[in-house]
Structures are given as C-alpha cells and as structure tokens.
C-alpha cells in the first residue's frame, strides 16, 4: 500500500462528517476493482471510522473488510 495515498485519504476522511463516511463506504459496495489506491482508501476509511469510536465489526473483523452490503449508522455502530 502506498503511504502517500493513505495519508491523502486519511486527511480527507478526517474532515468528513460521519454521514459522509458512511456514504463513502456505501459507494464502494459492489466495487470489485482492487489496487494499491483502493487498499489505501479502504484502510483510511475504516481507520477513521474506528478513530471516531464507530463499531465496524459488521464489516471488518480486524483482517477482512467486506463491502458486500450497504450499511447504516445506528448508535455509533455500522449495521447491515
């Protein structure tokens, strides 16, 4: 993963609202393309959600991240 891409995404996500972060997550549902930029994007997105105290366990187990389903934010928890 390219740290420059990660840092750029991390800075962008830090400035976003939680609603915007959830919308960004949902925008990735069904996207099967993968490269180093996508890896940086996904990691920065999940890291920002976790940094804000959001429970992401419905989509991330610490190793595997799933964009199989749209999510909603409910009581600071991502819910499928």
What are these language model-derived features?
Residues 1-80:
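Extended, charge-rich alpha-helical interface modules
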């Amino acid at each position: 993963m390219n740290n420059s891409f990660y840092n750029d995404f991390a800075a962008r996500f830090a400035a976003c609202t939680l609603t915007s972060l959830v919308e960004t997550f949902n925008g990735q549902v069904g996207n099967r393309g993968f490269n180093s930029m996508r890896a940086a994007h996904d990691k920065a997105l999940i890291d920002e959600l976790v940094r804000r105290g959001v429970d992401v366990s419905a989509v991330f187990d610490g190793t595997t991240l799933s964009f199989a389903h749209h999510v909603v934010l409910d009581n600071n928890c991502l819910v499928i």
